[in-house]
Amino acid sequence: MPKPETKFWHELKRITPQIKWTRIENTGSFGTPDLLGYNANGHFFTVELKVTRGNSVRLSPHQIAFHKLHPKNSFILVKHLGPRAVKLYEGSRIMELVACGL
């Protein structure tokens, strides 16, 4: 059975056909986001996918460092397995997300 994050990835890919996605399977560079997106305007951006049951979002120190170092064109997309559904955070808000949760 696929992990919740894998299911989230497949769902995102299905509902955003206008975005060209590259799934980054990177074990060599810790903290690198899960996805590289390319939109119709020719802009690249990264997305870290997270699935959570509670208010807190589990982010590694490497993921936090990546978003602090790359605050623009980077995002964290969080799927809450409950009534809050999906929220998108800019990479520049990483410390707020860590401190306050959803």
Model-derived features with residue positions:
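Acidic-basic catalytic patches of nuclease active cores, encompassing PD-(D/E)XK
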Residues: M1-N26, A40
